Regions:
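Extracytosolic ligand-binding ectodomains
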Residues: 4-397
Length: 397
């Protein structure tokens, strides 16, 4: 009986500690985190998993007592995959909602549109998009969590095509900020390794027919194709190529990695290659990989809560995790509801993010500096292949 009483007392103490931690955070005004993210429109397949994982992480932080004894409060706004809407959302989050930081920007076009608003509003903008123009040249208030296209994707996919036997590689890209960044990286890399593209084609973001471009590619004599786009348009390019009789290997930029592309590509998706962050194939990583533990943790939590894992969940995990870690170093006596204190919080947070070193994230190991607001080294991503309707770690046979 005494043992049972002791056990009950221990459980009660533990429960009261958890409750007190949440109560402590709930007793102070929150730090507002703005999340302008694409929940509708062409980039929604990126935005939805980002929203999901940010909510998941913030719930974890708040249950642990918040940051500096304050809860984190999310204000989530749908950018609708539209640059103009993104600018309006960013301005509202900064001026009306008094966000200490804004994170979740899903695409290059929407992110680029909002840069000036964040800079003039002196508030951290954390981008989840790939264009180098977002952070080169360095903007004081803008940071990124996505590896450079030149370092994360293009060389790996071109090299894989060459190893698959391609000698005349064609390239087709979506004609927007993301695709144009990909084109620049492709041109730089093929020139570096001394090969001439068979042909380069492009298509509009809203394209529903790319048969003309694929016909040009087929007639060029290309024996390998690199497609740089997002899930729906890239799947369209793949299906069109196969239906028009293009039988050579086709590889993709990392804009396709997720369950949406596999669903849209259907039978044509089997065997295609792309690149991904490690969490997508977490359990296949060697134990020696320093990111395996955090990757497995995210994969298991995400799939348990939401089902199929998405590459883009890692972007959200990194931005909210770094934000929370660096927000904890801000002067805890500053009140985010007071205008002058809010300015100081934003400024200290920015400086703390810029000073982040060796943060073990999903997209890589981050070390920012005044001259580098991307923070990621080469070699962050791994090659993946669709096998039996799932993305798996690519191991060249």
């Amino acid at each position: 009986m005494k043992k049972l009483l002791v056990l009950v007392m221990v459980l009660c103490i533990g429960l009261s500690w958890v409750v007190s931690q949440e109560a402590q955070a709930a007793g102070k005004e929150p730090y507002v985190i703005g999340v302008p993210v694409d929940l509708t429109g062409p980039a929604s397949f990126i935005g939805k998993p980002v929203e999901a994982v940010i909510k998941l992480r913030v719930d974890e932080f708040n249950k642990a007592g918040g940051i500096n004894g304050r809860p984190l409060k999310l204000v989530i706004l749908d950018n609708e995959s539209a640059p103009a809407k993104t600018v309006l959302n960013t301005k509202k989050l900064i001026d009306v909602d008094k966000a200490v930081a804004c994170l979740g920007y899903s695409s290059s076009g929407t992110t680029l549109a909002a840069l000036e608003t964040a800079e003039s509003g002196e508030t951290v903008l954390y981008s989840h998009a790939s264009s180098d123009k977002i952070w080169i040249p360095t903007k004081k208030w803008v940071f990124n969590v996505v590896p450079r296209t030149m370092e994360a994707c293009t060389p790996m996919m071109v090299d894989n095509l060459i190893k698959q036997g391609a000698k005349k590689i064609a390239y087709i890209y979506i004609d927007n900020a993301m695709g144009q960044t990909g084109l620049e990286a492709f041109n730089v890399y093929v020139q570096r390794i001394g090969i001439k593209p068979a042909i380069i084609e492009k298509y509009e973001p809203a394209a529903t027919d790319v048969s003309a471009q694929i016909t040009h590619i087929k007639n060029s004599g290309a024996d390998g194709l690199f497609v740089d786009g997002l899930a729906a348009d890239a799947a369209l390019a793949l299906k069109t190529a196969r239906e028009l009789g293009f039988k050579a290997p086709i590889n993709f930029g990392y804009g396709v990695v997720g369950p949406e592309f596999i669903r849209l590509a259907s039978k044509y998706g089997e065997g295609v290659l792309s690149t991904s962050l490690r969490a997508l194939v977490a359990k296949e990583l060697p134990d020696s990989d320093p990111q395996k533990k955090v990757a497995v943790d995210l994969y298991e939590k995400y799939t348990k809560a939401f089902g199929d894992f998405s590459l883009y969940a890692g972007h959200g995990w990194d931005s909210i995790s770094i934000t929370a870690q660096t927000l904890a170093k801000v002067d805890p006596n500053l009140d985010p509801t007071k205008e002058e204190d809010l300015k100081k919080i934003r400024s200290q947070l920015r400086a703390n993010i810029e000073g982040t070193k060796n943060f073990l994230g999903q997209n890589g190991i981050f070390s920012y500096s005044p001259d580098n607001h991307n923070g990621l080294p080469p070699g962050c991503y791994v090659s993946v292949v669709v096998e039996n309707g799932k993305w798996t770690l690519y191991k060249r046979k």
